[in-house]
Amino acid sequence: MTGQVRLSFDGPIATITNDNAEKHNAFDDAMDEALFDILGELRRHPEVRAVIWRGEGKSFSSGRDVGSIGVVKVSLSHHELMRRAHRGIQQLWELDAPVIVACKGWVMGGSFQRALLCDIRVAAEGTRFRLPELNYGVIPDTGGVGVLYEMCGPGVVSDLVLTGRVMDAEEALGHGIVSRIVPEAELDATVHEIAQQIAGAPAVAVKMARAVIRHLAVPQLRSAMADEMIYQTFVNRSDDIAEMRAASVEQREPHYTGS
């Protein structure tokens, strides 16, 4: 069954649900497109005062569906695909309503980065965060590294990106990546309570407070994402990525040259 991304409304609160539970809500191109359409639709609903983003099953999202990596179904260059993806997710910044992410299970790769572009993140106990992109011969390219740099500093970001190690919920709380940790059974209720509190506040005050925070963050994020687009395009055309793919097909150790 193909994964889906669903949108539902409960009064002034909208909920986005990642629904590919058999694959820990890993995203493919169709789910990306559905997500971007949903963000566009939310921009047309000014009555929405808060947005919850959650996942069905055991995880928020394990990132990219590895079965779809390298599978191109549209006639666009890699650079154009990245630009489309950036434009799609940057719609988060254009929403008047804050977005609260319910983190649980695995929060990985591009989905981890997308969560970092949102306003508030709450983690269930046992949540694990990871940026495994280098293992697949690519770099993180969804803007989250810029957010992590501000939160954690260059040392922790380098450790996470270059080793792909797992960060647990307690460490994430210590760095301010999440603002609360709750038992998993209480996660949905907790984020809904936060959404209700925000939705009950004066809407213009929420909008302006969010605008001030975004004014501080977005310029750096745009710059970071522009760099990611350039460097990821270079990586995609590099000798090393070609060698990685050839070695995988030929079942041998790769020999990288750094070019």
Residue ranges, per PLM feature:
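Glycine- (often His-adjacent) and acidic-residue-rich active-site loop
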Residues: 40, 47, 55-91, 107, ...
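Beta-strand-connecting loop/turn residues
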Residues: 12-13, 58, 127, 230
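Conserved CoA-thioester-binding segment of acyl-CoA-metabolizing enzymes
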Residues: 1-56, 90
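Crotonase-fold acyl-CoA enzyme core
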Residues: 90-204, 229, 237-238, 242-243
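Terminal peptide-recognition signature
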Residues: 16, 20, 35, 53, ...
